[in-house]
Structures are given as structure tokens and as C-alpha cells.
Regions:
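A structural signal for the hydrophobic beta-strands that form the central parallel beta-sheet
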Residues: 20-21, 52, 130
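Bacterial Sec-dependent N-terminal signal peptides
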Residues: 1-8
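Alpha-helical cap/lid subdomain in secreted, periplasmic
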Residues: 12, 33-49, 58-198
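Catalytic nucleophile-elbow at a beta strand-turn-alpha helix junction centered on a G-D-S/GDSL motif
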Residues: 16-30, 56-59
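Glycine-rich phosphate/diphosphate-binding loops that line cofactor/substrate pockets in enzymes
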Residues: 9-15
Length: 198
């Protein structure tokens, strides 16, 4: 399936107020600073405002609780949302009942996402884009303390995001699979290559 629904993701217009919502990957500011730089250098007569609503360590249930004051109160015309890395847990993947614990965390995440989805649907004057989160790298040889099957759990969350975007007519961009493909290619040359430092 197509990981990028470009036709449903309109470019930013002059005066657009864009809020990027997410976890530490958003909080770090890298990907949306590139978006801002692209628009600033190519469309200097169409200024936009980019606002970072990423908070490190957060999951969908945390994001749900701060939608009003951290997202909607900023009067955005455009909102992107990503989550999944923290939602899926970490050391649970080392436990004997990892599969069961993982399913519980995925369900908790998706339950919160359904609430977020309802709130976003009620805000009909803004463009919404869901971002399938970046991967957890299980194939790097950088270290041996890997959380096996963590990216599979992230992919289940991304699948729900993709379906919601399609159902609601929202944009969807998948960071996960393109980054996995690049990692696998680079690891053929250097087994310790990774984008993921968790």
C-alpha cells in the first residue's frame, strides 16, 4: 500500500499555523525544522508559523490529555500527529509474556487515539495529517540489547493511523517503512548503522 497519500496533503498556504504534535522525536525539532526551512527559503512571501507540540516520553494517552491547551488553544489551521514509540513500551519485550503485554499497550494506545480522533473530527476548520512514527531498529549490530518485535508493535499502531486517515479524508505520511529500508541498505555496508539511538 502507498505509504504517502500526497494528493490528500495540501501544501501550506500563506499564514498557515501548523502544530506538530508528538513525542520526543517531534520535541527534538528536526523534521519540522526542515519543513519550515524549505518553506522559508522557497516561499519567502508566504510566511507560515510552525509550532512544536512534542513532549519527550509521551504516548497517545498523554497527548489526549493536553489537546486543548497545547494544540487547540494555539489556533492551528493545520495539525500533524505522531505517536507509537513510547506507547509500545521498552523492557516489556524482554519478558516471557512480552506478546500479551505488547498487545495490552497497543490497545491502550489505540483507545486513546480513538478519543484524539473524535476531538480532531470535531475541529473541522483545520487540516489533519497523521504521521506513522519512525521505526525502532531491531536489525542494527550497534548493541545487543534490542527490544525484539517492538517495531512490529509500532507497525500495528501505524496501521490504525493509516486506516483512520483514509476513513476521515486526512493526510498520512509513513516515516517507518522508508527509514527501515534505508537502514537495511546501509547495514549491508556497516552493520552498526542506525537512525534509532534508543
Amino acid at each position: 500500500s502507498n505509504s504517502l497519500y500526497a494528493q490528500s496533503i495540501p501544501p501550506f498556504k500563506k499564514g498557515e499555523r501548523v502544530v506538530f504534535v508528538g513525542n520526543s522525536i517531534t520535541h527534538g525539532g528536526h523534521y519540522h525544522s526542515f519543513v519550515w526551512l524549505y518553506y522559508m527559503t522557497r516561499f519567502p512571501n508566504k510566511p507560515i508559523t510552525i509550532m512544536n507540540a512534542g513532549i519527550g516520553g509521551e504516548s497517545a494517552w498523554d497527548i489526549k490529555d493536553r489537546l486543548d491547551y497545547d494544540v487547540f488553544d494555539r489556533k492551528p489551521t493545520y495539525v500533524t500527529l505522531t505517536f507509537g514509540m513510547n506507547d509500545t513500551g521498552y523492557d516489556i519485550f524482554w519478558k516471557e509474556n512480552a506478546k500479551e503485554l505488547s498487545e495490552q499497550r497497543i490497545e491502550k494506545s489505540l483507545e486513546s487515539f480513538r478519543e484524539i480522533e473524535k476531538r480532531l473530527l470535531a475541529e473541522n476548520k483545520m487540516t489533519k495529517v497523521l504521521i506513522g512514527g519512525s521505526p525502532y531498529d531491531e536489525t542494527t549490530k550497534l548493541n545487543s540489547l534490542l527490544f525484539l518485535h517492538k517495531n512490529d508493535a509500532i507497525l500495528k499502531i501505524i496501521d490504525a493511523q493509516r486506516k483512520a486517515a483514509k476513513k476521515n479524508g486526512w493526510g498520512f505520511v509513513d516515516f517507518n517503512q522508508p527509514m527501515v529500508q534505508i537502514s537495511l541498505e546501509e547495514q549491508k555496508k556497516d552493520s552498526t548503522f542506525t537512525f534509532c539511538r534508543v
